[in-house]
Swiss-Prot record:
GO terms for biological process: intracellular protein transport; protein secretion; protein targeting. Involved in the import/insertion pathway in the thylakoids. The signal recognition particle is not involved in the insertion of SECE1 in the thylakoid membrane. Belongs to the SecE/SEC61-gamma family. It comes from Arabidopsis thaliana (Mouse-ear cress). One of its GO terms (cellular component) is chloroplast thylakoid membrane. It is a single-pass membrane protein. Part of the Sec protein translocation apparatus. Interacts with SCY1 and ALB3. Its main location: plastid. Disruption phenotype: Seedling lethal. Albino seedlings with yellow and translucent (glassy) lateral organs when grown heterotrophically. InterPro entries: SECE1-like (IPR055330), SecE_bac (IPR005807), SecE_sf (IPR038379), Translocase_SecE/Sec61-g (IPR001901). Keywords: Chloroplast, Membrane, Plastid, Protein transport, Thylakoid, Transit peptide, Translocation, Transmembrane, Transmembrane helix, Transport. The gene is SECE1. One of its GO terms (molecular function) is protein transmembrane transporter activity. The chain crosses the membrane at residues 140-160. This is Preprotein translocase subunit SECE1.
Length: 177
């Protein structure tokens, strides 16, 4: 079985046209509509790339007809190589399946005792902050809670005194009777 491939040589250099490279008035706009301003050099590059692509296609067409007879294997070779590939694929599939079964049985053997040791291992891997930083942050949080509690209780006391003076000791139940 022989496989042959032909690759075209890499294209190097830029082809230049013999036209004047000064931009014409049609290419210059006072307020460009497109985000890309088209100049003569960009249009020349696009055209040269197009010509290069056409040349490569033509070369492949001429070279492709010569190499088609070499690249096309006979039907007897195809059937033999196809069976070999199927055997290789099935052997690889069997190896993968056996490895998966071994992994599954190994995981079942470890059982749930492995769970707690895994948790302990993960806790060890956590990057804990410094103890002093934790105490400082906790102190700030407790201070904010205590301060806001004092402020809210003071506002509640003042509003209760104000309502007692405005309504002269009458409660809510006195308004409905």
């Amino acid at each position: 079985m022989s496989l042959t491939a032909q690759f075209s040589p890499p294209v190097t250099g830029i082809t230049r046209s013999l036209r004047d490279t000064k931009p014409s008035l049609s290419n210059l706009r006072v307020f460009p509509v497109y985000t890309e301003i088209r100049t003569m050099t960009t249009s020349n590059l696009r055209k040269s790339a197009c010509f290069v692509a056409k040349a490569i296609e033509q070369r492949r067409d001429t070279a492709g007809s010569e190499s088609e007879s070499e690249a096309t294997p006979s039907p007897a070779e195809e059937s033999g190589s196809g069976e070999d590939k199927e055997v290789e694929i099935s052997a690889i599939g069997a190896e993968i399946k056996a490895a998966m079964e071994q992994r599954k049985t190994a995981e079942e053997e470890k059982g749930k005792n492995e769970f707690l040791s895994g948790v302990a291992e993960e806790v060890k891997e956590i990057e804990w902050p410094a103890f002093q930083k934790v105490l400082g942050t906790t102190g700030v949080v407790l201070g904010v809670i205590a301060g806001s509690s004092v402020v809210l209780l003071t506002v509640n006391f003042l509003l209760a005194e104000l309502s007692d003076r405005v309504f002269i000791g009458r409660g809510v139940q006195d308004f409905f009777s």
